[in-house]
């Protein structure tokens, strides 16, 4: 019987995406997240409130490796990679532990973290292996979160979808920068966007996004490609959305202003509290005006508008 190894990394919440992606780059076959914030204010589909859970500043990233991988080498490589990034982000004191799993345990552990989740009034994210009957008017996003890009329920993703729901009216062109699982592209299509162009620097993300898009019928209007932010892109868009770390977002704003049509929008998420002022200042210096600012826990998201009429924007 094949066995698997479970490697758990305890890290500050803002390090979730960074550590998850590093673990995948170091050979993980899947990653799951345990975050006490996921239970705050949650209700199930019948309206029942989940029990109170003590809130922690740290989350646990669990990575799965086949027994052919030497996880001690993975641990050492992970520590080395993170030490190079400590100037950009305080991840706290890493705690790392490993456990051996049988193959059937791997399958059970992998899927137990993922349940259907109502993200907005109209959109529900459903794991690809789950039978789910939609209610009247409910739109379903099928996702297979099997390669670490999450289930779409992280606060940064939720706020991105809220923002898309705010600005999309139908018929728009959308650029999805750092698409990851492809969830924001799929959401954009369901919310009426005419054409979506999704980019990611990571070849794994490009493949996973394409696979998730194929799980959802009618998504022929989504085009996925490898790309480094918006470098070399010449497609004008009504909306640009980027759910990536703040230290990467700051390299996006000038190209975004070049490509967003007049009266169009730039949505940015994945911004920790300490980086918010920096991101806002750079977006405004590029020419955008802040229209909406959202906060959930440590995370910030925002909607900026490219407009000459500033009467309806913050500070206008």
From Swiss-Prot:
Q: Which GO terms describe its molecular function?
A: protein-lysine N-methyltransferase activity
Q: Which principal EC class is assigned to this enzyme? A: transferase
Catalytic function, reaction form? L-lysyl-[protein] + 3 S-adenosyl-L-methionine = N(6),N(6),N(6)-trimethyl-L-lysyl-[protein] + 3 S-adenosyl-L-homocysteine + 3 H(+)
Q: Does the keyword Signal apply?
A: no
- What InterPro entries does this protein's entry cite? Ribosomal_L11_MeTrfase_PrmA (IPR050078), Ribosomal_PrmA_MeTrfase (IPR004498), SAM-dependent_MTases_sf (IPR029063)
Judging by the UniProt lineage, the source's domain of life is Bacteria
Function, as annotated:
Methylates ribosomal protein L11.
Q: Which NCBIfam families did the record assign?
A: prmA (TIGR00406)
Q: Which family does it belong to?
A: Belongs to the methyltransferase superfamily. PrmA family.
Put simply, this protein is called Ribosomal protein L11 methyltransferase
Q: What is the lineage of its organism?
A: Bacteria, Bacillati, Bacillota, Bacilli, Lactobacillales
